[in-house]
Amino acid sequence: MQATIHNEFLTLTVDTHGAEAVSLKNAAGEEMLWQADPAIWKRHAPILFPWTGKLTGGTFTANGKTYKGGQHGFARDLEHTLLRAEGDTIQLELRADDAMKAERFPFDFVLTSTFRLEGKTVHHTLTVQNPAAAAQELRFGIGYHPAFNVPFDSAHTTEDYEFRFDQPESPMILDASPNGLLSGRCYYQWKNANSIQLTDDLFANDSFCMAGLRTKTLGIYEKDTGRSVVCNVAGYPYTLIWSAPAKPVRYVCIEPWHALPGAETDPQEWSERAATACLAPGQQWETTLSTTFDR
């Protein structure tokens, strides 16, 4: 099922499968989200929960039992309950049930996704709650993975675009092995850079996971017109940029994360792995990604 909201600038459609934004159009009716061509990348803007990236060994252990887990968790692959779709807001919820705890993740949780339109900005808030009746603490990872159409129109090509910071940056890049797990190494790709030129080969070796950014915003800009899609990444310890290795580039992802993918040296025990947060029963945690579409 899908729900749609709109204002004078934006029309947003969210699917209950994965609580995923699947369409965002501007006032001219131009589609700004990637439309999930399965030959290139079959998603639009998935939610990453309860982990980001890959698990070491594709598994984790909790309470003496081993669980298998795919990339980026499972929230993106499940049906969420639509709570509200009116005015400028869409809200959905995913609750752990007995089957989920037996097969996927043995912890109680409530994940609430709230989309709100404000002018040309989409605010997407993720709230994680450990229910008061839960038997144990909740450890989790979480992140965003929106994909934006590039080029913005047929008159432009890949080289007409660049990523821009709002101040000079020398981001530390966390290196990943070919298997997608962090290697434990890091390097510097750009120094004192205000921008990163987009090319068809930029992501030939996969994504760039940037740590320690000081910038409040990171956006993709059309150089000759100034049109842009800009994400507020303030407060996120890690921000990734990525696109599938298709030529020419068809979309770019700007991905603020509160957790890292698995590392080659990670323990199997879930309680020993790094997490976004650890919530005692009755506690909750939330984050918001605000993205402005000036195009």
Residue ranges of each PLM-predicted region?
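Extended, loop-rich substrate-binding clefts of extracytoplasmic carbohydrate-active enzymes
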Residues: G70-G119
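Asparagine-centered strand-capping/turn motif at beta-strand->loop junctions
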Residues: V14, V128-A132, S243
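Short, Gly/Pro- and small/polar-rich lid/capping loops
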Residues: M1-E8
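Acidic, contiguous internal or C-terminal segments within carbohydrate-active enzymes
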Residues: K101-D153
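Acidic/His-leaning functional-site neighborhoods
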Residues: L10, N26, H72-R84, A193-A274
